[in-house]
């Protein structure tokens, strides 16, 4: 699977005696857990984006000849939380995060998927609730990828090329989240260290609330209905 390079890895820093060191080496993920809050559809958009996240994580680790994090069900040092509409209340998020038995200080990154009727503000609000839940459980918030109208693109996510027209923005957003998770950094800090030229969200959000123009979504639905 061809992958587009997400962000350059943060550069090692140099100490006063001229010795290079990477101050985030100890924070690199070794055990990644997966939490799914949604419709539990095996081939739905949430499952597809999660699978793509883990595939990209493994691919970039191999390209850089670094450790491929182990996928675990408990005692994770990093959690990937996927949330789908209808967006869950805070108490549900808290309950599921407690169930993971994640290590103290574990980093949490979220993927929030909305349907056609879910606004960017609603998805941002959900990400904020997840952040609050993390802080109350003494987990470290890493940021979130928000994806709009995911169900309108469900078939494209399964069949279209990863960096083709229909999936490109979502794939690029996923790659940016992968870069942050692999670095053990919040999304905004990872982008700053990598020298990103795109605007940096102060709330550590990657906004793909409009993955394609609205008029092309109508075409996509027409194509899916005709070829179904």
Question: What residue ranges belong to the model's regions?
Answer:
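N-terminal acidic, proline/glycine-rich, low-complexity intrinsically disordered segments
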Residues: 1-13
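Glycine- and acidic-rich phosphate- and metal-coordinating loops
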Residues: 36, 109-113, 146-147
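Active-site/pore-lining binding-face segments in mid-to-C-terminal subdomains
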Residues: 125-186
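C-terminal and late-domain segments of enzyme folds
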Residues: 168-228
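Helix-loop-strand module that forms the ligand-binding subsite of alpha/beta enzymes
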Residues: 16-25, 29-31, 53, 69-138
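Short beta-strand elements in bilobed, periplasmic/extracellular small-molecule ligand-binding domains
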Residues: 58-67, 140-145
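Acidic carboxylate-rich catalytic motifs and surrounding loops in phosphoryl-/glycosyl-chemistry enzymes
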Residues: 68-71, 145-150, 187-198
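Short, charged N-terminal beta->alpha structural module
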Residues: 30-64
